[in-house]
């Protein structure tokens, strides 16, 4: 996830786009970041016997509002059905939110099968979430997270840009690593230097 993904999404919405797609590559930290930015989190997976379920962190599954098993066509159809069953079973163990129970479906991008149903499901989610005020609450929570993230980034940048801090930092690090200064005292000293500049 790029540093300015939220800003890019906000600009797209301001320009009148009512649907903004955010794609990630793989399972990891980026999914958690995107999960705190979007209204609907769709996990797209390939057919597999369910063995890969062990490799997917529970936290990622908890983020998913829906799972689509792609390539559910040709020789992969049977495997896609098995994969769907594995994920339905796993998802049934997770708590649902206040208005939506995560769904698992199959599709074939190659044959354009299941794509319309996927879109219909997302629109159903949007309608239910809007009616219950859940999407508005989710956006408000996301904005608070964004504020915290921006505050952290801006403070880090100020620390990095402060010549006094950068000059003192090697000595402070040396004192912390030798035990002559506690990490807490060091952090307080650095923050005080930042405050003395204003």
PLM features: residue spans?
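Nucleotide-state-sensitive switch-loop elements of NTP-binding domains
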Residues: 1-30, 37-44, 51-52
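Residue-level signature of catalytic and energy-coupling elements of molecular machines
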Residues: 5, 23, 60, 70, ...
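Canonical P-loop GTPase G-domain recognition
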Residues: 66, 72-132
């Amino acid at each position: 996830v790029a540093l300015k993904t939220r800003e890019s999404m906000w600009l797209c919405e301001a320009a009148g786009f009512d649907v903004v797609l955010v794609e990630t590559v793989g399972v990891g930290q980026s999914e958690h970041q995107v999960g705190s930015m979007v209204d609907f989190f769709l996990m797209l997976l390939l057919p597999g016997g369910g063995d890969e379920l062990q490799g997917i962190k529970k936290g990622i599954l908890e983020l998913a509002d829906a799972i689509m098993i792609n390539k559910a066509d040709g020789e992969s159809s049977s495997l896609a059905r098995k994969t769907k069953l594995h994920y339905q079973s796993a998802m049934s163990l997770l708590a649902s939110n206040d208005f939506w129970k995560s769904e698992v479906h199959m599709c074939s991008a190659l044959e354009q099968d299941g794509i319309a149903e996927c879109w219909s499901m997302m629109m159903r989610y949007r309608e239910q979430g809007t009616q219950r005020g859940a999407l508005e609450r989710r956006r408000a929570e996301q904005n608070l997270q964004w504020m915290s993230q921006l505050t952290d980034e801006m403070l880090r940048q100020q620390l990095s840009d402060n010549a006094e801090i950068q000059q003192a930092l090697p000595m402070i690090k040396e004192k912390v690593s030798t035990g002559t200064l506690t990490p807490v005292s060091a952090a307080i000293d650095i923050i005080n230097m930042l405050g003395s500049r204003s």
